[in-house]
Design a protein with these regions (language model features):
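N-terminal prosegments of processed precursors
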Residues: 1-46, 115, 168-187, 194, ...
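Short amphipathic alpha-helical interaction elements and helix-loop-helix interfaces
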Residues: 15-17, 28, 37, 50, ...
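Classical protein tyrosine phosphatase
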Residues: 21-45, 123-142, 254-263, 267
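A short, surface-exposed interaction/processing loop segment used at functional sites
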Residues: 30-71, 256
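Cysteine-rich modules of extracellular adhesion/ECM and protease-associated proteins
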Residues: 262-423
Length: 423
């Protein structure tokens, strides 16, 4: 499916934070996507049609996962290796008002195999980029937005290892070794056909140390600092539970690294004319901006992160700002994907070894949930996996919805609403 075809039935409303795909099949309308941070909509092809011949749809709730507090090392030690050539005076005159970063997405078999049709995978990835763009909506000088220009299915790119299932210790599962997988990606795919490549694995990223412990699965993505338009490592990597929109909460952070932003509290000089302020060396543990080192939010960037990205972009050549793809996936988004996602189904995909799948909210204010199961049918003892992110639009209780990682009063489009008054 090319960008022109996709554009015909994808709809976006940037202000209302919604993304749905509308497709006409056999004289009926099929709708799939995000209605809110918790609600999703999906067709029910096996259900009878209405008297008017319309295809039945289901609106269901979805919840999400989170960064582990130990997720600090998502940039490799060599992240600063190529920056000497960047630390130079550079003019901003060649930088456009809007930087459209072209994105090539590569997905592995554990991820793409969960989609029945190629069109469904393309739609899901396009909606993901739309929601990532919303996190970059308040960037300026330049405004940064991403264009999905190509998708590649790569059956196996992860270095894997078997270990006990964190959520179900009685069984094993396959993990992707984070460091060696990312090194392989840099070696084999580091030169992107676009401005940046996003490698998405359907496996859990982890450090394959022995003895294996739960904390080794804290890393959920990796990137090199300043990777955009780099000839050797224009690559970021994230994990994602297929259909969950979980990587929407991870990609802004990793792409921020690729655009020159270190973790909050750290500084890097890209342009001697635009040095980082001394205040940027201070890191407040209470300000959970997107580039927080251990507990990132997914709502907005700190001013220091924005300044780092501006300084990095000022060092890029004009060729990086030229659009190289002949077509891309522009989208029009109506409702947020969280409006229609079924969290139980997400738990089934994320935790196939579970005996049953129960969704339990956790840290509602940060929009997260757990997938839990009884250890046996004759026991009340339960086990839970790692936290997941609630997608944009999902219900987080008390008539609130999650939008950009915040539980608040929003409608299904992501627009702020007033608190409902009790009778």
């Amino acid at each position: 499916m090319n960008g022109t075809e996709l554009q015909q039935y994808l709809y976006q409303d940037r202000w209302k934070m919604a993304a749905v795909a509308v497709e006409e099949i056999d004289d009926t309308i099929k709708v799939m996507g995000v209605l809110s941070d918790k609600l999703r909509i999906a067709p029910l092809p096996l259900m009878p049609r209405s008297e008017e011949g319309h295809l039945a749809h289901r609106i269901y709730e979805m919840e999400r996962s989170t960064y582990h507090e130990g997720n600090i090392a998502d940039t490799l030690p060599e992240e600063h290796a190529r920056t000497k050539g960047r630390t130079r005076s550079a003019s901003m005159n060649h930088v456009p008002d809007q930087f459209l970063v072209e994105v090539h997405v590569m997905v592995d078999e554990p991820h793409y195999s969960m989609f029945d049709r190629r069109e469904d995978l393309v739609t899901y990835l396009a909606l993901t980029i739309v929601l990532v763009n919303m996190r970059y909506g308040d960037t300026s000088g330049p405004n940064i937005q991403f264009l999905l220009t190509s998708i590649q299915k790569e059956e196996k790119f992860a270095r894997t290892f078997p270990e006990y299932d964190i959520g179900w210790p009685d069984a094993n599962r396959t993990y992707a070794d984070a460091n060696t997988t990312f090194e392989d990606l840099l070696k084999n795919y580091g030169r992107s056909p676009a401005d940046i490549t996003v490698a998405v694995t359907g496996l859990i990223l982890a450090d394959g140390y022995d003895p294996f412990i739960k904390g080794y699965a804290a890393v959920r993505g990796q990137a090199r600092l300043g990777g955009v338009c780099n000839e050797r490592y224009s690559m970021v990597m994230v994990e994602d539970v297929p259909t969950s929109f979980g990587m929407v909460s991870l990609l802004p952070h990793e792409l921020g690294h690729a655009l020159g932003a270190p973790h909050d509290g750290l500084t890097h000089t890209w342009n001697e004319c635009l040095p980082p302020r001394n205040e940027c060396r201070k890191n407040s543990q209470n300000d959970h901006f997107i580039m927080h080192p251990s507990e990132p939010g997914n709502g907005k960037f700190s001013n220091c992160s924005k300044e780092h990205m501006t300084a990095f972009i000022s060092t890029l050549s004009t060729s990086c700002f030229d659009l190289k793809a002949k077509q891309n996936c522009k989208t029009q988004v109506k409702k947020l994907p969280g409006v229609s996602i079924n969290l139980t189904e997400i738990c089934q995909i994320a935790h196939p070894n579970f005996l049953e799948w129960n969704v339990e909210p956790v840290k509602k204010e940060n929009c997260r949930f757990l997938c839990c199961s009884r250890r046996s049918l004759n026991s009340y003892e339960k086990t839970c996996g790692l936290e997941h992110f609630l997608p944009d639009g999902a219900d987080c209780g008390d008539a609130k919805r999650c939008v950009k990682g915040t539980c608040g009063y929003y409608d299904e489009y992501g627009a702020p609403t007033t608190q409902r008054q009790s009778a």
